[in-house]
Amino acid sequence: YESHWDKEKKQPRSKSVMAFGYVHELISDEIPDPVAYYTDFVAEKNKERAAAFTEETRPRAFVAPVEYNLGQFLLYTLLEELNVKEVIDILAAQMRFQFRIYDMIAQLIFSRIIYPCSKSKTVSSVFPHLYNSSPISEDQVYDGLSFIGGSYKKYIELFNHCYEQHYQRDFSNVFFDCTNYYFEIDLPYEDKQKGPSKENRHDPIIGQALLLDADLVPVAMQMYPGNESEKPYIRKVIEEMKSRYKVSGKTVQVADKGLNCARNIYAAVKEANDGYIFSKSIHGRNLSEKEKKWLLLENEQNIWKDYRDKDGNLLYRLKSCVDSFSYQFKEIDPETGRDVVKTFSVKEKRIVSYNPALAKKQKAEIQKMADKAANYATYKAMTREDLGDSAKYVKITNKDKNGKKITPVIGIDKEKVNEDLKYAGYNLMVTSEL
């Protein structure tokens, strides 16, 4: 039998592909056990059919396409103007590739603009549709990327040099950001390490830092180990990239709350005379009670500006303030070797937004996590792996009113649930750029 999904009836259906007959009629000297024989027969036919289906549906990288994409001509002209082809071919000459590295780079750039997708799908589904493209296989793309990745800074310097022959760089402000990527490795190696990603996973990741000029044209890029904290690394990377590429302008660090810490703000504003645009967490102890109260406040001094669609439905709300805010952080005194607390203040603009659609989504997620946490009635039945993010709503009481140890009692942290529900839909941005 063969099963398939019936779209009209919206249910699985089966059809007979081949009938063998009754067991007692199939018994013979050649087939003493028809059940075992035809079980193996069906398994073999299924393998053949699966192999044939895979071959029929496998994307062909070099099949002549019916239509071509022409949208890359603007970028094609820019690459031709930069005149990097000859130098790139010289850099790759030692490898004796059966394809041109420049052609691979150009086609990957064009494909990223036309239809961003995985490298495998790019080769099979996008390359063939590029007008006047070169036939480059998936294996060749990975070989070429591995070669470029070993000395990627050379290529960045080449493109920077050629770009500056034609265009004036604006370094009055430069922007910095970093992110990380998940990838597959058997063992950690150099900058490929296991560490926490933005999705709170601890799978192998690698970090990437990017520096842009005032026109948002990339200046520098640097990879760093995924098991290193981004917070101290941001300072090191900015210093290295600005020094390497002779950038003297003010750097505005743009980052999410993962990089927002007092030490980075101090390094940006006080040490380097730079700026920052950070998102800031509104939960936990990141904000004082006074600051949290301001988020929800609406009066003559705290006016929200509403943005609505053409039908009058609220899309989002914004309000802002400018004030001096105090920060503090611990660092080791180089002379005594002891921890010292450094306190400083900075004039900062804070922008808070409220999105009703986001609030609805977050409230549903909070309620779902709270309900999940409520299902664990005993301490033994509860593990952090089972709870996941719901663990933050679990309250464990292991002492009585007199401070005496008791059997752990599991409960819901209603105060935490109510606080998260109250601030659902709100986001906070802080910046030195007034």
Task: State what each model feature region is.
Residues 1-103:
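Conserved glycine(s) in the ABC-transporter nucleotide-binding domain "signature"
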Residues 85, 89-434:
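Anion-binding and metal-coordination hotspots
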